[in-house]
Amino acid sequence: MLGVCYYPEHWPEERWEEDFKAMRALGLRYVRLGEFAWSALEPTPGALRWGWLDRVLDLAQKEGLAVVLGTPTATPPKWLVDRYPEILPVDREGRRRNFGGRRHYCFSSPAYREETARIVALLAERYGRHPAVVGFQVDNEFGCHGTVRCYCPNCREAFRGWLRAKYGTIDALNAAWGTVFWSQTYRDFGEVELPHLTVAEANPSHLLDYYRFASDQVRAYNRFQVDLLRDNAPGRFITHNFMGFFTDLDPFALAEDLDFAAWDSYPLGFTDLMPLPQEEKVQWARTGHPDVAAFHHDLYRGVGRGRFWVMEQQPGPVNWAPHNPSPAPGMVRLWTWEAIAHGAEVVSYFRWRQAPFAQEQMQAGFNRPDFQPEVAFFEVQRVAEELSALPLPPAGCAPVALVYDSEAAWVFEIQPQGAEWKYLTLVFSFYSVFRRLGLEVDIFKPGAELGGYGLVVVPSLPIVRKEALEALSQADGLVIVGPRSGSKTEKFQIPPEIPPGALQALLPLKVVRVESLPPGLLEEAEGPWGRFAFGVWREWVETDLPPLLRFTDGGGILFRRGRYLYLAAWPSPELLFALCQSLAEEAGLHPRFLPEGLRLRRRGPLVFAFNYGPEVVEAPAPPGVRFLLGDRRIPPHDLAVWEET
Amino acid sequence: MLGVCYYPEHWPEERWEEDFKAMRALGLRYVRLGEFAWSALEPTPGALRWGWLDRVLDLAQKEGLAVVLGTPTATPPKWLVDRYPEILPVDREGRRRNFGGRRHYCFSSPAYREETARIVALLAERYGRHPAVVGFQVDNEFGCHGTVRCYCPNCREAFRGWLRAKYGTIDALNAAWGTVFWSQTYRDFGEVELPHLTVAEANPSHLLDYYRFASDQVRAYNRFQVDLLRDNAPGRFITHNFMGFFTDLDPFALAEDLDFAAWDSYPLGFTDLMPLPQEEKVQWARTGHPDVAAFHHDLYRGVGRGRFWVMEQQPGPVNWAPHNPSPAPGMVRLWTWEAIAHGAEVVSYFRWRQAPFAQEQMQAGFNRPDFQPEVAFFEVQRVAEELSALPLPPAGCAPVALVYDSEAAWVFEIQPQGAEWKYLTLVFSFYSVFRRLGLEVDIFKPGAELGGYGLVVVPSLPIVRKEALEALSQADGLVIVGPRSGSKTEKFQIPPEIPPGALQALLPLKVVRVESLPPGLLEEAEGPWGRFAFGVWREWVETDLPPLLRFTDGGGILFRRGRYLYLAAWPSPELLFALCQSLAEEAGLHPRFLPEGLRLRRRGPLVFAFNYGPEVVEAPAPPGVRFLLGDRRIPPHDLAVWEET
Amino acid sequence: MLGVCYYPEHWPEERWEEDFKAMRALGLRYVRLGEFAWSALEPTPGALRWGWLDRVLDLAQKEGLAVVLGTPTATPPKWLVDRYPEILPVDREGRRRNFGGRRHYCFSSPAYREETARIVALLAERYGRHPAVVGFQVDNEFGCHGTVRCYCPNCREAFRGWLRAKYGTIDALNAAWGTVFWSQTYRDFGEVELPHLTVAEANPSHLLDYYRFASDQVRAYNRFQVDLLRDNAPGRFITHNFMGFFTDLDPFALAEDLDFAAWDSYPLGFTDLMPLPQEEKVQWARTGHPDVAAFHHDLYRGVGRGRFWVMEQQPGPVNWAPHNPSPAPGMVRLWTWEAIAHGAEVVSYFRWRQAPFAQEQMQAGFNRPDFQPEVAFFEVQRVAEELSALPLPPAGCAPVALVYDSEAAWVFEIQPQGAEWKYLTLVFSFYSVFRRLGLEVDIFKPGAELGGYGLVVVPSLPIVRKEALEALSQADGLVIVGPRSGSKTEKFQIPPEIPPGALQALLPLKVVRVESLPPGLLEEAEGPWGRFAFGVWREWVETDLPPLLRFTDGGGILFRRGRYLYLAAWPSPELLFALCQSLAEEAGLHPRFLPEGLRLRRRGPLVFAFNYGPEVVEAPAPPGVRFLLGDRRIPPHDLAVWEET
Ligand SMILES: [Zn+2]
Ligand SMILES: [Zn+2]
Ligand SMILES: [Zn+2]
């Protein structure tokens, strides 16, 4: 199903009906609205103006549109900030962050909790049973603009409380953090500060607990809104729109309080911002890197326990990346189908019409500011027609499971130990390899059941909790575990049995030394799949297991016991490809070697093939299959769908 | 005429007479002094020490030197700052900027207005009728060190007042800024903050109004001094020394209150700092880029309504650029003649003698700290002799007019939309092409009359006010309008008729989509002048006009109706050259193709040819002309002057 | 002799005896401890817990280990900071720096002086006569994390007092700083601020005095502790562990109050951080640049007036550089011998066992966190055995003396005048050339006697005080003086006789102009040793001396009178090599041309040869010598020692 984001408060009332009719005519079913409308609803404290929203919802109902109503808490009005200036967040540099953009509130502020309670309860009471309203979006893009972590006095108080609840006694905290180091022993929770502007680097356990706390605060704030909504909106779903390449927040935890996950998909903006070589940024500037959207579809499908929406889909140039190219013709359609192939229940575009004013005036929509349709309009028209003709079977499980961990991102952010070590880069490089191999991936948090997967990939899991170890133990496929896994305890200490810590139960080896390498320093390795040059990270392993791959100085780089493998280095793309291909073959997953711009995705018996490249490619379909969309010859930026049984 | 900057307060009194005699002997007529002398004049509050300056001026008078007296407000003394700490400016990061350098005051400070009134009135009363004093310089280099924009409480108050005066009602402001976006609706002007340290980017209309306000505050402060001076200094001119490559301030507006403009010309420092490829920085390290000084001469001649001085001319290495090379021998003479050829009424060098102490001790002067003459001394001696032998006809109009707009710089600073889009880079690349074509350029603000110019160039003019449109309509030459022109209303909104907005009256086309491109992503275009590869910026145009140049995907890049042309992309230097050459030929301007280091400038019937390059070049003079300086063979870093009729 | 750093407070008491026994078994004699143990000693204010340290020291005594006891002032406990929050330092940005790392105190804080007096006196009283305690280390790495320079109110007060003591009258200060420039004349010392956050750059004399003050404050604080210790610890030495490539602090001055110097040697970390081309960083990533440790050995031997220790020697990967590679096998042994060859009295490793917790958990030690020995353990075992078999003669004087000046580093930090001008880079490039020439270097502060050295090198000495001039006058070898020497007075002014100022007594020439060059702008020079291309810096010299080397435009680059030479440019490595080789030959020092990775060091009749390279090299030993370690064929990362008479 398709939807769109709409801001009735931006347009004259006489245009609403016409817009809603045009949405329906285009084939849209959902409309999201309201998420930045606080000052339109409450222009002065307590004087609620419901009228316009009443009329919008009635009109939507009349036109057959289902409304997702956003709570407006991402943008507290100026009067609220002036009344409670302490709700403004404080950045890592200790500077109060001002009103004038959005997300100008601290998750720990008691005053903001009260104001949130007031506006959300009012909203839910008034519209929770409105027939047009099918669900709610809580707030908008939690954490955007670096807002998960705040350094204000309210956060300091809340952090101290969080620590007290976690540790019980200050001695337990001292032991966990190793505060005996550098004389940091605390006598009371009230002595603990927020870890910023320290003279030397802060204690890593202190930082990790603070990052956990900050993520927890967002979750608690979301939960606070969810509870208010549930009370007043029977039968309505509640979701939130997560972001791409964003790790400050643990989406798996937060989504436990949601009905499903949603995310905002801007493939071109992400491609310009992600750490790719410049030539790849240029190569994919108009299509987005072929795995960027797919990765997040899989991630948020996991986060949503199988259910997800794309709440904001890029329909044209955006305004917030360093460079904002125009999508190649066909890409909006392709991205939509990629989302659907991955199981998206709804793809909702951002936005119905480009606003001619304010911060996002350069972000394109379905319609231009002069009310004429944009390119994307016609591409979506086509998707809507195609969709109505194509019955979608439910998506099954993927052959590959990937374990993704927000906490891992925090651990390595705190302690990279090598400037090039980036958690998301490692995860994405594993993910990309499977896409090139034509293999679908399901993404799980640590501890999720992994049974039934032919191949389980753990790019890196520094902290291995009991449930994660159990899940890995019970996996019945091949399990490949990446470097630095098991290298820390939950307290951010080196485990007593040294790395990989608890994983030694599965992989009897010890990592006795690690090193990070400067750019240009490559180690050569050799094995059954050829020779590979490695950089970034290397580990020394003591074990009785014979290495499957060795550095030329003799050190092992890949070890295996039974179905468990351990990779003791940052893998080069070439090694990763050879290794994953080999394991996939062993697991009977029938990997392919797809052309550079081609990607596949199955949904039940349907196979979707997407051509992100600039040349025609042949669909890797068995002879004689029936094509439901397109045909064997896939033009650039186009797709084909066929049925395999 | 020639002059020099002198700091009598830096030297023992017994040296003054000798210095003044030496200046006259060198052929100098003007001496600027006093602009940093506040604490020498008023070492403690209210205790004025006029004696030394009395003696300096009498001596100057005796020696036949005409004095330009600076008001000393760029450097309030420490006692003043201690008495009124609130005059210290606050930077964008919210930090109070301290005493210890210069320009440590806020233009909005009421206390500083009072202190300014006091010292300037005293100065004007005492010296406004002194026979040696021929004019005043207000303050020094307004805006230097990022001081146009201040974020202090006084500025906040003043900004609120400025908005109230502009908009009248807060509803008008809300509508203009589109504050309905992100719930930023204000109820009162007292709610509006300065746009900094916001969590997400601030509203662009808010930013633009703040930048306008900040520029206005400087103008008002200058006007405040001008009024004080006019009252007490009959017949004396008033000017200000503007800076190079500086856009925070609108010089056209400020100069309306001056008798003429002046600027400070440091070709080597600017060349090291401007955004050139490193190889060009090296190429021009000892000469300055050949168009840097010329561009500013033309700009400030326009700002000065035809009249300008060079108030500070670089005579040797400076101290403030990342690299400070020595000018090639001959360059001080060449720069001087370039200024004169552009119509400079006076070229005044900075400074008479290198100070052995304090911040600028590494900045060379005419004399070394040991009182010996520097290289520049002898070059200027030669210029003075040459000048006295060469009668200078008045300068006429140039064949090309270029429209320059400070507001355009602000718009693109606020909303580059592509990291490489820089207003000055675009303007300078147009300007440089005409210099290479041997064509003089006059520079105007938008709205100035453009009649009589064979070619009018508008590199980019995002906000097209009524008077600018009228002036363009009444131009009688060819008019080339660059990308993003007409793309914003005065309110910083997309115009209702979409870009190029009001320009559609002249150019019936619509820009329906724009994009910025990452470095390395080039689009190919083809047309009558060849094939060109473009990056940075592209626009999609809907129009019935046939394109003169097309991208290889068919999109038009250059459109024309009658004498108006629209360029829908960031031009490559190659295209710009071909296009401007072709238009100049059509306009009958007889463009040439000058060698890389050669530049021409006419002043009446005189043609000046400047050789910035390291090789001898031949002067492009018709056969048989009379050479007034040099001859047909121009050595490196030298010049020739001949008469054409 | 060998030692190790140990943190008993990090380990269970039952392990101490076992650890001490293992240290002795390994051949270690010294153990440093206690320097971060304040909160272990005084967990709450006034409640001292001596018991554990009593037992540690008694145990050390019993096991035959000599203890170096650190004063714990680098890490004041949280309760102390909470009681006196004003001890926290303030950074250049004006931000209070928080508790949570280490070195969170201001050297000017009266409260911290009191607390220091209390804890150091208690410690000295209790342990100053303990038989295990042979000496004290004051604090730890003074200045680490940018803590020499603080911008707090206490420092402002102290700086004003320091200025008053230095100048006596404010007029003297005004004259010295040239405050007449930019109206900065002060009426009272109480008007002077700390030089930061100024609108334009601060006055250089102001900055230099502040940098001197800041260095003096550290020295005074150290002296304060030394006095407390001397009173209570008869016969115990007092030292401090200095850092590498660190210039904020003048180590020569501070060490006047110590018995000898110590320093912390981390060759790999320094190599990753120093300004080397990336390819050299890669080349030496696992060995350290071959001259990094040697340079500091020579520097701190000079600082220690002939006596120094390595207090912390890197034994494996560290955690604080951008990249932290593993040392090549053999390097820990090689580094140890390099230190000993340079005269180190003790080499003490950091640390006995890798801590599994807190900030330095990724820094390797002799033992892993699981109590197993690391690679370094076995290398040191070998060194200990070799040491006991090799009688070490005293080290003699080197043939080359190098003059090193912290103040020079400050002058050029304040006024680089060219972005690439870095004092340490210049010094290190001179030093490296002599290492390649097989010539030892002694390092002195300006003013030290230089008699007996065949060659004296002054890379750059901007401020030449009377005693420095005298020492150079009395040198009896060749003296090469580098660019910008003599270019400033003690007041940070250009000397009246212009540069090289007082050095004109030795070198009758005047530097009449200087310039810095952008990268890529090279000047060609030619002379007896060939042609060389130069960048970065060039000077113009007026003199009757004929140049030994000329730029191709005729300007001289190298001048000589008698045994004094002046170099008027930033030297290229090629020129430096040719020049130093030639001078060394003239001086009869018998320079060699060593292979790239080979280095020599004499200690009495012993010659040590170190192979930092990856290939076997031949020892440059005369035929027939006796090898005491290794032999003529030196494997990679190995050494040889032979006797020459
Ligand atoms: Zn907060
Ligand atoms: Zn202000
Ligand atoms: Zn301080």
UniProtKB/Swiss-Prot annotation, chains A, B, C:
pH dependency: Optimum pH is 5.0 with ONPG as substrate.
Gene Ontology, cellular component aspect: beta-galactosidase complex
Catalytic-site annotation from UniProt: E141, E312
Keyword field: Glycosidase, Hydrolase, Metal-binding, Zinc
Keyword presence, Nucleotide-binding: no
Annotated binding of Zn(2+), by residue: C106, C150, C152, C155
One Pfam short name: Glyco_hydro_42M
Biological process according to GO: galactose metabolic process
Stored Gene3D superfamilies: 3.40.50.880, Glycosidases, Golgi alpha-mannosidase II
E.C. no: 3.2.1.23
PANTHER family: BETA-GALACTOSIDASE GANA, BETA-GALACTOSIDASE YESZ
Record-stated family: Belongs to the glycosyl hydrolase 42 family.
Record function comment: Hydrolyzes chromogen 5-bromo-4-chloro-3-indolyl-beta-D-galactopyranoside (X-gal), o-nitrophenyl-beta-D-galactopyranoside (ONPG) and lactose.
Protein name: Beta-galactosidase BgaA
Source organism: Thermus sp
Lineage of origin: Bacteria, Thermotogati, Deinococcota, Deinococci, Thermales
